[in-house]
């Protein structure tokens, strides 16, 4: 191809020189007469230069076949040039110059078009993404009235509420899943089954637990309460103040009541045989824990007062009374569950009117087969005393058990509202630093 380019250049030069000498050679004459010998010379020169073959080798008769091959190739190029001359009568020099100019002009055109397309893309991006109106809504949504302020307020409130609900529902997730993926069309049964599956607890086959660790925690809590009661007599003083404030509400035949004994025990309750099961009549929509509790201790409360005979005049006769009531044994099956306000019905009007019915509650109750043993001591009289009268003991025991059954025995239960588990600033505390532990360098 380089040789053809040189040939084209020579042809153009030949034409120009011919014009300068006012001698015109047609393209047909050049192709038929001059071009074959010229091409043969070019091929032979290239072979001699590339392979270092002497000139005498090309003139020998042994290479007649090679010369014939070269002549055939020259004839091919001659026919090609004839076709070009018949079609356009144009020279190779003008063709190459036009191709070079065309390639340069196509590069400039592509560069300009590329820059222009980039500018158009930037303009569309700035217009539709940067300066777009974010407050525009769909045409199907109702537009607020410009004449009514209340309409504008209600519309903005609805828009904000819809935006906030959609926003929070889209970002709230549980374990990588959205809120709608986990809660839509899923009842309490599915949620409980999911919980049991994730904690590897089978209600039907899981054995009962001993709760030894729980007994240790409860024992530490009770021991702390007892130490505070022993170091400070705040419980006794508080109860005496309470009874004194209620003296005006006491019957007229009772004198002031004073506390003579308060025994908070020295033993601890034992919790055992804990098992999780479905609540009865809940259709497997609620779980509860059954725990057996056993307390073998002495919890005593003693008082003294006087019976007054106010007829025919006040304090005609006075009869001293001393009572001591002690619980020495308590056994029961404790039922504990978590619930909300929608799962139970209040038993009194005061409970029904309470405003704290939202949130979750810890519900507990005792089975009807509970056992509560008492040790009741009574002493009536000043000189001739009546001690431990069975009738008094039975009456006191009956009223205590009645009070307990009406509040804590199934189907009645007690609910304790659970506090919020989210961290709050008002519940934050720091450990108090003792001044004796401060280094001397900081103290100075």
Swiss-Prot record:
Residues 207-419 form the SMP-LTD domain. GO terms for cellular component: endoplasmic reticulum membrane; ERMES complex. The chain crosses the membrane at residues 111-131. Keywords: Endoplasmic reticulum, Lipid transport, Lipid-binding, Membrane, Transmembrane, Transmembrane helix, Transport. It is a single-pass type I membrane protein. GO terms for biological process: aminophospholipid transport; mitochondrial genome maintenance; mitochondrial outer membrane translocase complex assembly; mitochondrion-endoplasmic reticulum membrane tethering; protein insertion into mitochondrial outer membrane. Its main location: endoplasmic reticulum. One of its GO terms (molecular function) is lipid binding. Residues 1-110 are lumenal. The keyword Magnesium does not apply. It is found in: Endoplasmic reticulum membrane. Residues 132-444 are cytoplasmic. Homodimer. Component of the ER-mitochondria encounter structure (ERMES) or MDM complex, composed of MMM1, MDM10, MDM12 and MDM34. A MMM1 homodimer associates with one molecule of MDM12 on each side in a pairwise head-to-tail manner, and the SMP-LTD domains of MMM1 and MDM12 generate a continuous hydrophobic tunnel for phospholipid trafficking. The SMP-LTD domain is a barrel-like domain that can bind various types of glycerophospholipids in its interior and mediate their transfer between two adjacent bilayers. Component of the ERMES/MDM complex, which serves as a molecular tether to connect the endoplasmic reticulum (ER) and mitochondria. Components of this complex are involved in the control of mitochondrial shape and protein biogenesis, and function in nonvesicular lipid trafficking between the ER and mitochondria. The MDM12-MMM1 subcomplex functions in the major beta-barrel assembly pathway that is responsible for biogenesis of all outer membrane beta-barrel proteins, and acts in a late step after the SAM complex. This is Maintenance of mitochondrial morphology protein 1. The gene is MMM1.
